[in-house]
Amino acid sequence: ASDVYKRQMYGDPLPEIVQERLDRELNSIISNGYAVMYIIAQKLVWKSNEDGYLVGSRGSVGSSFVATMSGITEVNPLHAHYLCKHCQYSDFDSDLVKSFSGRSGCDMPDKLCPRCGKPLSKEGFDIPFETFLGFKGNKEPDIDLNFSGEYQSKAHKYTEVIFGEGQTFKAGTIGTLADKTAFGYVKNYYEERGVHKRNCEIDRIVLGCVGVRRTTGQHPGGIVVLPMGEQIYTFTPVQHPANDMTVDITTTHFDYHSIDHNLLKLDILGHDDPTMIRMLQDLTGVDPTQIPLDDKAVMSLFQDTSALGITPDDLVNCQLGALGIPEFGTDFAMGMLIDTQPKEFSDLVRIAGLSHGTDVWLGNAQTLIQEKKATISTAICTRDDIMIYLISMGLDSEESFKIMENVRKGIVAKGKCDKWPEWKQDMIDHNVPDWYIWSCEKIKYMFPKAHAAAYVMMAWRIAYCKVFYPLAYYAAYFSIRATAFSYELMCQGKEKLEGYMHEYEKRKDELSKKEQDTYKDMRLVQEMYARGFEFLPLDIYKSEPHHFQIVDGKLLPALNTIDGLGDNAAVAIAEAAKDGIFLSKDDFRERTKVSKTTIELMSDLGLFGDMPESNQLSLFDFGA
């Protein structure tokens, strides 16, 4: 199927550059025995797509063109090129295309196919395969996939269909004692026995306790696969998480890191982006895979607020339209956007790399950009940048790969790389600038470019809907990503909301975690109001348990936005409402099992209208 797909896309015979990349990758994948991982990942992704959910790739699997052609990842790692999907014309080596080396194909200007006159597709992110498997296939690959949180459990179940019942197990985790907990245990032990110990002795005993197993759990997405004909007990005991026999889940007893060299582990993780994109597709009818990655209005969200039709004065402490966009909506990320002034998709990929690394931006790239020693284009943003740049400066490719691996894992920064003095001298001998070497010595962890590209593609699609389908965007965001939405605080109009925001601002250093989350949601609600959109009053008969709805050009809030009303209670109200109207508040409480306090709050918010307190009629009701 992959062979048919690639020839449908690139033509038959394949362009030389495509054939060469496929041959090089396949040789490395097959000779090292990794083909089975690709086939499993392909089956899982195809099944999810068939059921209506996109899958995002994590990590460096997007570096593999074989993964792209297998449908495992949407990231095309070839260098920027034009492609006609009607007649298979391709352009890999015109001067214009070559000028986009190291950048994303989607940033190239629009062109028509010289052969058939149709608009050309702009492809490629220029990512080397070696980031995934190394130059000799000697790096163990890891195919991590982001499934919709709503679909994750189905994907886990589907592994049983692929391998058979009893062949897959949830990966176990081991929770160990942390410093503070161990200190508490030791201190309490001696206090309870009336024994006085010096602090240095307590510290000595604490050191012996730190790291000791405390409990067991399960990895959020790890599935361990057993080879046919083997028993799991050959490799590890199995158990229920935290030894809870009532739980219907079996995990490996050993931490999966202890056995992942002996057994295949699949990372089937849950993520909000695919869920949100599915909801946006349902609300708008727009196919997310057809959203252009070069729309100027969408790009402007990362520069100012003009595409939203508002000014920064309409918002509290926000100069951009990036609020609520995955990867870019935090104050930290927006500060980076203001500092770096992105102009194209490639810049966003680089910024995503900077923002997710450790000691890559603060005290590193930010300083270099401020001192005009580097730009967003020349600073080290993703791990691939190091290898590509060093090879371009004339260093040996295998050595460049090893330098990249040691820098991106923080081994160099921690002073634990014995080869670093030799490599550093080699870099100096090849005229690598001092600032570049200084930057390498600071980095503690780096993202792969493929991961950054995959995440930015998802974020861009959501940003596109924010510009062109605002109500659908806000409905999806408040349904899926908002963590502390409050009907009482946010849906009573712009003035009331801003009053609450002002109150939160005054004590911003004292806000609890829940209040911080509430304030984060308030900012997006304020933006929605500024764009001229409103909420309808919540309706106990029409509102859905968890999802906001678009009704008559306004948003109808979900039931679970009422403070104190949990997800289960919201479902109970929706189910009870299907059985007919509530005769009274007593009837409502009886049928929904909602607490008295919550009913009083709902009553104060006017959600019951003129509903009587009880089913009993008074003589005064007849006299009315």
What are the roles of these predicted feature ranges?
Residues S2-A624:
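Noncatalytic, beta-rich nucleic-acid-contacting surfaces in large DNA/RNA-processing enzymes
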